[in-house]
Design a protein with these regions (language model features):
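Extracellular jelly-roll beta-sandwich "head" domains, especially the C-terminal globular C1q domain
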Residues: 1-132
Length: 132
């Protein structure tokens, strides 16, 4: 899904997220659905002792499509210690979300990766699974 709106330049915690072409929308789902998002990507740390967070920038929206809340949904951090510099690792972290309200069903979710040191990312694919 591609949407060219202010959401694609969303910011949270003082960090501006760019290169945001595409997001997930849940408007064909139902309150009570359980969603799993798996991101497959290769990551090459440029320095040892690098911590990487993978998740979604989640923006709930009201019935008029106004963003009501924006926050990050993250999973366990990935850590690359000594001896990992310059090596490429396949990652498949999973982030989950429970659609608890109509605002969640009308939400947009933008995949995001943040690292505390420079890394190379090669995106591969995503898998979005809905449990009812």
């Amino acid at each position: 899904f591609g949407e060219n709106t202010a959401y694609n330049a969303a910011s949270t915690s003082g960090t501006i997220f760019n290169a945001a072409t595409g997001s997930y929308r849940m408007d064909e789902l139902n309150v009570g659905d359980f969603c799993q998002f798996r991101f497959d990507f290769n990551l090459t740390p440029q320095f040892a002792n690098t911590t990487v967070e993978v998740g979604l920038i989640w923006a709930t929206r009201d019935a008029s499509n106004n963003v009501t809340f924006t926050f990050a949904l993250t999973g366990e951090p990935l850590f690359y210690g000594a001896g990992t510099t310059g090596q490429t690792f396949l990652n498949r972290p999973v982030t989950t979300a429970y659609l608890a309200s109509d605002e969640d069903v009308n939400a947009r979710a933008l995949p995001a990766i943040r690292a505390d040191q420079p890394v190379f990312i090669q995106p591969l694919t995503t898998l979005f699974t809905v449990g009812r």
